[in-house]
Curated annotation (Swiss-Prot):
Protein name (database record): RNA polymerase II elongation factor Ell
Coiled-coil region list: 853-883
Biased segments, Basic residues type: 990-1001
A single cellular component GO annotation: euchromatin
Classification of source organism: Eukaryota, Metazoa, Ecdysozoa, Arthropoda, Hexapoda
GO terms, molecular function: chromatin binding; cis-regulatory region sequence-specific DNA binding; RNA polymerase binding
Organism: Drosophila melanogaster
Amino acid sequence: MTNSIASTKCLPNALSTGNYGMSQSHRYTDDSKEYIIVKLTDSAFRAIEEYQRDDNAKRLQPGQRAKIQFVGNTGVIQFPRPATDANGIPNANGNGSDATGAGGGGGRKFGFTINNMEGTLECVQQQQRSLGVLGAVTLRMRIHANEDVYDSTRTKMAIAEETEKSKCIREIKPNQSDIGRKVKKPPSAIQSSASTASAFSSNSSNSGLTTTAFHHHSNSNNSGNNNNRSSSSSNSFNSNNHSRKLGSSPFNGLGVGSSSSSSAFASRSPNPSTLGAIGTVNGSGVVGGRYGGGAASSLASTFANGISQGYHNLSGSSPRDSMTAGTSSATASSVISSRNKMPSGGLTSSNSNSSSSSRSANSKSSGGNKMSDVSRRNIRERLIHLLALKAFKKPELFARLKNEGIRDRERNQITNILMDISTMSHNTYNLRRQMWNDVDENWPFFSEQEVQQLKRRKPQNLTPPMSSDAGSSTSGQSPTSTHTGSPPPPSSNGGPGGVGSGAGGTSMKRTSLEYDETMFSTVQPKKQRISHYKKDTPPSGTSYSSAGVSMSLGSSGSSSRSRYTPPQRQPGPLDDHSTTDLSYNVLDNIVEFMSSTAAATQQSMEQQQHPRSNSSNNRRGSSSLAGTSNGGNNKDKRNSTGSNSSSSSGYETQQDRQRSTTPMSSNRSSASSSTTPPKLAASFVPAATSGSASGTSKQRMPPQQSDYNSYNSNNAQHVASNSKKRMGSVGPSGGSNGQRQRSASGSNSGYQQVPPPSSNSRSSIQQQNQHQKQQVQQKQAPSQQQQQQQQQYHQQAKHPSPSQQLAAAAHAYAHATADTDSSATPRYDFSQYVPIQTLEVRRRYKTEFESDYDEYRKLLTRVEDVRNRFQDLSERLESARRCDNGYGDYDHIKRQIVCEYERINNDRTIGEDKERFDYLHAKLAHIKQLVMDYDKTLMSATMAMAPTDVVAAQGPDPAVAKAAARLAEHHRRQHHAAETIKQQQQQKQTHQHHLQRHLQHHLQQQQNLLQQQQNLLQQQSVSNSDDSSDSSDSNDDDDDDDEDCDDSNSNTDDDEARY
């Protein structure tokens, strides 16, 4: 390493942009040198510069020059003290020992530490025409701070603290006895009050006579000279001013009135912009180095009870008399007394003891005591209240805590506490929502500005979750928030000696506690509006009340939400119906454009036809909703009846939802068998349509399931009878709506819906009723045929054999999927999935379908494995029964089926997977059916809009037709893809089945061969025993044995050929 240490200097700008390039011709590095990047402190940098400027340094002995010494990864750099300092003044001790050094051989010593670099750098040297690479920089040297740095920092902090303590204002109360002295003024001072004030300020700063409050001027020349000296000395005094104490000087009781006198006193007062925190003056402007009259009057007015006029005349009465006058209540303004050192030689106060005592009193009542108090608080509380004000970056947070005071052990806890109470985004810490409960608005260390800032931030982060207008744009204000356009709420000076901030303000401020109590006592937070309206449920044929008809006919231009009972379950991602997520990617933008175009066209049509009747229709529709459905009962009129065109008309109760579930089951069972796919329809087919079918289905069900179905059937009969009794309270319009019938029969659970706004006439509704009746009649015929087939099957299976029972059990479990009979009772309640009315609901349904489909596929694979295992056992049992040769294969397979059945029944995981599979199967089928129904409705509505008269007058819209065509093509592709996947799965299953059958046939042949060989061995043993018993016929037996052997060999040959 080189002995010379060069200072960092900027290289000349010899290279301009665009006129040079970088190319590496050769790379020469000197391995004998090691390059280190050095980070200097200010004192070390100054020491290097002083050493370079010292001419005597070159003539020093080698032992007295600058030295650097390495001790492992640490070391010391020593510089000899120069003979002269930076100003050319010779040092007293020369190269001797320095007070700030480390002792020893004199000069200055700096310790350092060497660490490895995190990255790799290269040291480059600029030459005449090129840049030379000297080598890689792999080490970093950090110079340690010396003791003189700590001393200078300690001195600066002491000066700053003294300056901060001196910036305070003392409040003089009217009942104090030591306000000031009573001084009589000469009559000549009455005419020249302004000149007297200026002369007073000059005399108080330049003369040594301070025994009286107002100096008696014997001649005018002296006063003129003093005025001249005042103008020059005040400017110099203000330029060098650091702090001015507001002590108890002899002029404490003087009131401030006119502009000239206020400017004279303000020239001695500190700059208000440098005063901060509690108990200081903020917001006053400085014009030409002095305050204006408004600032002085506001300073005076904040000490009294809203005084509007100052102390205009300095003569006639003393400051004490002016304070005790009563009516004018002139305020006592603190007059700033100068410090000891003055440009003219110094001002000696005759009341030094009182000044020192007042200084100590002011230092105790200033903000320094608050800072010490906040440092004693828990660091977690301090961080919570700081983050409640605004989002802090980590350096800002550490700087704030360092200024307020922090312990060393608390410094190590800050990172963990921040991770617990805040979230980090964009390198800033934001307070968590749940931590706002720990924020105290009456935190004693907040300033008035911070209290207002907290009140503005808190409503944004603590909006009540049950508020009805939490998501609306008009709920931005809260009882505790402060609107930007309104004046700030009044607040008072809470701390000792505190003065309100505002120039020229004349009203006293209240505390934030009074403000909060006033606002909370007058304005109560909104509560959720609960509608106690109960809608009567009509029978299955008319599952649509008259409210829907009145709403659809009266307020066709309004958008009404579907009313349904929220399910009793944990809130999921679909509970928040007000959120709009753009990441669903279910529909293309053209579909949204189509819907918005159709809505805009319909709205313009309705505005042209009914420009003035929309609001009245809305009110009439809502009133008919409350009148006709309640049957004239007026006790449930608490629901909102005016302006409900864009809000739901209330929630149903849980009992209403149960009542509306079962009466519509017959229509849903017939409709769902044709509208849903064959494989998916049976999993959510409603209750049985006849008693015989339900009775036969109970024979094959477990006892729990049969009890469940019997309970549902009894409940359905009970509710149906109750609904017939309630028919009288429903108006004639309740049975004239066929659109609700179609939607209710096409759905798969008991719920109620409000159809989309439309302008259908009564004739179209009657046509829909007729069409619905025809569909019900057509769908009842296949269900009757299925019931007859089931009856025949059960009559044949009245007395099955045990083998038939085992085969039936294995076959039933192998086919125990969604292919249940149509008379099965729905076990799941999907009432929360209402029919789709908007594209947003369709997106949510499609998203939930996609999220559950992966789990459904996994469960399907597990169920298929169990089903395939039982199917193989069933086929093996059937084949063993057909070719029963008495070898025990049939009994072995039967025992295997029983063992497998018991294992699956005892395995809880398989049962849970099967139940979850059935639920997802029914749920996905239900959602798919709702989406298909909405798409069909949308297509029909789009096609029906074209031949209308209004559209004919305006001309056809090609965008709508194109969007409809794209939507149809999109659904066709989806259906084709689903069918393709289904075919591939079926082919795969068929192929696996054929392979399994081939393997089973091969194993069966091997077992037959082994059995034949065993039979041959048994026959041979029998023949050998015959030879030993009968010796006389041995020759014949030998011949017979040979023939038998030939026969056996021929049989084995035949068997081997067959194998």
